[in-house]
Structure formats: structure tokens, C-alpha cells
Amino acid sequence: QGSGAQERIDQYVENAGSLMESFVRDTDGDGVWDTGVVIMGITFDMSDTEIPPRDDPKGITEDNPSGQIKDHKAFLSYADLLIHEESRPEDCELCHRVYESPTHSWDLERADVIPNREAVTITGLTPVLHDVSDAIYDELMDVMLPLSLLFVGIMMFALHRNAKVILICGTPIIMTLFITFGTIVITDRMLTPMIISAGPILVGLGVDYALHLTNRIEENRVRILEQRAERNWALRRDGQPEHDLDPWDPSISLGATVSAALTTGHAILLSALTTIIGFSVLMWPSIVPIAPMRTVGLTLLLGIFTTFIVSMVMVPALVQLLRYRKTPSAAFDSLWDKIGEVPVRVYLLVLIIAGAFTAYGVMILDDELGKEITGSADEVPPGLASYEALREYSIEFQGGQTNMFIVDAEARGELNGTAPIRDLPILDAIERMQIEVNNVPNTTSISLVDILKAIHVDSQSLGINLVSTSLWDLIHDECWDESQNPFRPDCLPYAITSREAMVNVAFDTLSPEIRSMLMNADQAGVCQQSSPCETKTLVYVNQPYIALKEAGVLRGAIDDHLRGESSCNGPLSCSALGLDGAVNSLLTGGLPVSLDINEGIHDAQRDTTLSTILILLVVMSILFRSPRMAVFTMAAVGVVVLWQPILMRFGGVNVNVFTAMIGTIVFGIGVDDSIHIVDRIKDEGESPAGIAKSVARCGQTVFETTATTCAGLAAGLFVAIPGLRNFFVLMMALLFLALVASSIVLPTIVVAYRELASRLMGRGPWLDYEESGSLSAGFKSN
């Protein structure tokens, strides 16, 4: 204020130099700054801050009797309240301005999804993550869940032509989901978008268990009624009174249910045990270091166990209570009779086609599944102001991806009368490191050095005759070394103080906010020295949001500079500074964490898949009492995993946080389908007719469960998030392939093995209908 205020401000801005580019930009090229940023730093734990609390989503609990919490979300709500609601237009006109038409800084290609732009928008990684999570939750609950229930009901009615099946299959599924996810929330487990992957598995297995059991009970009921009808014909022929053919006779219902429990129930038990043991791998910290993935593993274990118990108890009771009878469809049954003959009659053709696709999938496996997990705009719900503002900031300021490295001089101690970080050799070493880091493309850095260079002082007030002196230039002036030289009269004023004292003056000039964001705070009661105890400082490294693959190269280049000429003793102890007692860390922050999580997810997927295959082979060999059938079962599941890269390449699906867990889902449902087919083949016998009947009967149920699960997933096509839509499309395609693998490929492998073994042992063709009977005859005899 006062006379010359604007001139002084202009001088401050001019003195700041390139540092201003980090805070203001001219986006339309008219020479006037029109866009600026205010950078805020927040602590991880907000509980001791003075922000208003928000309601705890968990309500009043023993750990939180007030039902109120202070966290980042509460801070963001408070900041938004201060800016947009409690600010007065006369004090902050910008706070109430809204741009309804595109500005120069908008991405015009996304103009159709960008909301009306507030002139002041709170953005950054934390607000975006909260907004994305809330939007995904709203999409799933408000759009997908109602449509999913509707589509599942329609599909069940279309397949069974009886609305009662919706209650029989839907009730156990809903109970399982409530019990499982309720338990996860009550136990306060970490929840992330990855938990979405557990839903389709539990729904798929729930439908699978319920339909297999329901259809087998109905199949047994029909068989018992046919047997009684034959006996009635004999009684009628002999003139004796006939038995009542009531399908709900207690003895008939009991016989049908017990027989189903001993056959299909056995297969369901094998499936539940196998999938529980297989998914237990996701909970091993040695293989899965990522906590959200372990939460998925726990959810699956609890959910599968609950699904098995609830289905086995409730389905028979609901069938009897509702008096459910499946309306037969002669055309559908006839179609599956024909499909059942495919593995027997054209097994060579099936093997050739499946082998060709599998070989191609192996060829492109590393290319497709080895891709970096993306975080593109397609995976963000449209219309999020915080995301659009962050995208705009990344483009205009070439920043937004905030990284940093730590300089730690604690071991160096107090030298030259200053705190460790204030020591001039430390500051000079930081400047040298910044020069190297800034030479990396798309990279700029900010540190204490830049702040000291940007702040200019009136040297005349200090008794020193310099013009336009920055704090950095002042503490590096050569006159500090010549202050006692009589031949340098210009340096005599420097004798009244010392360079070290001037360094402290320079640092004390910085505001508490600047110092708190760049250095660790003074430790009251810990520090035993007169000078401040600043021992660490942050050097911020800014980059725009770019593809992780490209950003990974930049991260590697920066880390090479931070390692220096010698190797590091861990990520926090590198010697690039070249000073005793001073170390620096490797790069940390948003980009390195994203890259490490990306690598961790890929490694965990690979390790869990391999571990699951080995464990399931052992478990199924024991449960089936046949290593051969265990290998056949895993082969059928494995080909689906190997077909996934083909779908991703030709379907244009990328690897993102949603699709990253698809392999786990397919494994869970694929193993279940294959176990049911194998168990039915064991019941019917490994003969051409037995295999054909197993496919015709059990394969039909597998088709019904697949169709029902896909109907539920089809609701995902109506969500507004392209990344989620890709997830559900790929999920449905892989479930269909799992159906093909279990119902066609698996029986074909059994037929091919039997045929080859028979010929090698000199017994002639195994597919000899003269000895084993025709397929149709085999159906009737069974």
C-alpha cells in the first residue's frame, strides 16, 4: 500500500524471474498473465487441525464415539466452503465467477464433457482421487446395481421360464454380498477400486452354485417321477392300484435333494475348496505386497465360503417352499444334445482351433499383459471439475505430477554456526543437483535455492553497496572472503557481520509457510543447540502428466543423477551430494509411487497366477484322486488366460486399474465351471456317451450361469466411465470363452487322451460306437 506500491510489486515480480512460471501463465499469448495457481500443502493426519469435522461414514463407533472425523475430505469441503460460499463478491470477485464457454486453457477436444468452469477450482491429486472414487461409487450404486438386478432377473426368467428361480438364485447371492462386504467394512479393511473385481466373482459363483443345485434337484425329481411312472404302468397292467405322482411328495423331494447334494453338491464343495485355496495366494504378503489386492483375497475367501454355505442351505429349502419346477424346452435340450456330441465327433478340429488361438495368445502375451497400467481420461468419470482443472494445469504449467527427493544432513551436524540444511556447502550441492535434474526433459525443480534466488533485498539497508541483490547472490558475494583486505575498500562493510550470520538472516526472512513446505520443522524439546534444528529439506521435481512408460524413462534418468557415482545404501541414502554426513534420497512422490504400484500389480498378478496354478494342481489331484483330471482341468482354465491377450489386442482394451484383476476373476469362475464338467464326467463315466451326456446336461447349466452373470455385467455398459465399460466388455467375453473352454475344450482333451491311449496300447479306436453304444443310446441307458 501507499505511494509506489505497484512499482514495488512489479519489482518483486521481475526479481522472481523464472520462478514465477511455476505460479502464473499467459495461456492466450496476449502478454498478460491470465491463469495462476495457489499451492497448498496438507499433512497426512488432519485430526489435530482446526478444520470443521465431517460425519464419519461408519457412524458412531467404539473407536470414534463422536461420529465425526477430520480428514482430507473434510479439509476439501471446508476449503470449498471458504472459497465459494463464505467469500464476499466484493472481496473475491473471482471466487464467484463461472465460465460457461471455453477459455484458452481448455482442452477443446473434451469440451463436451467439461462442466461449467469455476474461475477458482480446488484440484490436485487428493481432490481428484476423492472425486473419482465418489463418482465410481455413485455410478455402480445408482446405475449399474439397479440395471444389473433387472437384467439378471430377465435372463433367469428367459432361461427358466419361471419367475421363482429369481428368488431361489437371487436370495443367496444378495445375502452373500451383504455378509461379505459388510464384514469387510466392519473390520475396517482398506477399500480401493480393486474391490470391484470381487463382485463379479461372488455373483458368478453364487449363480453357479444355485443353478447347478437347482437344475440337479429338478433333474433328479424328473428321473424319480419317470421311474414311478414306469412302476405305475406295471401296476396298471397288473390291475393293482397306482402310486400318486405328486412331484412335491416328501419322499420324492428328499430323494431328489439328497441325490443332488451327493453329486452336484460334491462338485460344488470341490469347487469351493479349490477356489478358496487358490485365492488364498492373494493373501500372502510375500507374493502380494499390495494391501488392496490382499483385501480382494480376503473378500474372495470369505465370500466363497459364505456363498457355499448359504447356497447349500437355502436353495433346496427355497425350491421346496416355492414349489419350483423348470419349464422344459425341447428345442434348447435338443441343441445341447448336439453340442454335447461336438467334443466326441470333431475332437481333432476342436484341438486344432483351440491350439492355434492358444499359440497366438502365447506369442502376444508379454506385449499385451506387460503394458503399463494406464491412468488416462477414459478411466475418469466425465464432468469432474477437479480432474479437468488438473488436466488444464498439467498442460499449461507442464506440471501436476509432483515428485521430490529428500536431502538429509542430520549426520553432518551443526557447522559454520548454522543449522545443517542452512550450511552453504549443502545449498551449493543442492544447486548442482538441480542443474542436472532440470536437464531431464519435461522436468523442473524448486528448492530453497530457487526461493533464495527469487527474493531480492535492499543491500543499502544492510550497509552494503550492491544493486538488486538476491539473498542467494548476497550470501555468495566474494566480499565475504575479502572483508579484511585493505585493498578492497568496497568489501569493508562486510566485516560488521559474517557470511554465516547472513545465511541465518536470509533463512529467517522466509515465511513460516515457505519453510514448513521445504524443511522439517524445528523440534522443540529435542534440539539441544542454539540455532534452528533444520536437518532435512525437500527438492520438488515437477513434471506434466504423461504416459507412465515415457515417465518411467524420465524417472530412471533422474534417479541416475540422484545416485551419483557410487551406489546407494537404500532408497533414502545416496551420496550424490558429495559431502560427508549428507545424503539424498531417490525420487519419490506421485510418479515413482505410480510406477512402483504398476510394477507391483504386474508382478503380483504373475506370481499369484503361477502360484495358484501349482497349488490348484496339487489340491485337485488330491480331491479328484486323479492327477490326470487335475491337469486337464487346469489346461482348460489356462487356455482362457492365454486367450485374454487376443481379446485385448483386437478389442482395443488397455491395462488399467480395473482390467488388471480380470485374470483373477476368470481363473475363479473358469476353475468352477471346469470342476463341474469333470465331476459330471466322473459320474457319467469316461465313455463317448458319458462325455456327451455330461456336456449336454452340465454344460447347459454352465451356459445358464454364464449367461446370467453376463447379463448382470451388461449393466456396466451403461456407466459413464469408458475404462469401466472396457472392463465389463472384456469380462463378458472372457466368461464366454471360459464356457467354451469348460464345455468344449475340456471334454475334447479327455476324448483325445482316451483315443490316443487306446491306440498306443493296441486296443484300437476308443471312439468305437459298436462297443460303447451310440450317443443316443448312451443317453437313454443313463
List where the protein language model places each region.
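Membrane-embedded transmembrane helical bundles of large multi-pass transporters/channels
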Residues: 47, 63, 67-70, 78-378, ...
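Short flexible coil/turn linkers enriched for glycine and charged/polar residues
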Residues: 35, 399, 533, 579-581
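Soluble periplasmic/extracytoplasmic beta-strand elements of cell-envelope proteins
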Residues: 39-41, 121, 406, 538, ...
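Extracytoplasmic
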Residues: 1-63, 74-77, 81, 90-114, ...
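Juxtamembrane segments of multi-pass membrane proteins
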Residues: 340, 347-350, 354-492
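Solvent-exposed, non-transmembrane alpha-helical starts
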Residues: 47-77, 380-383, 414-431, 546-556, ...
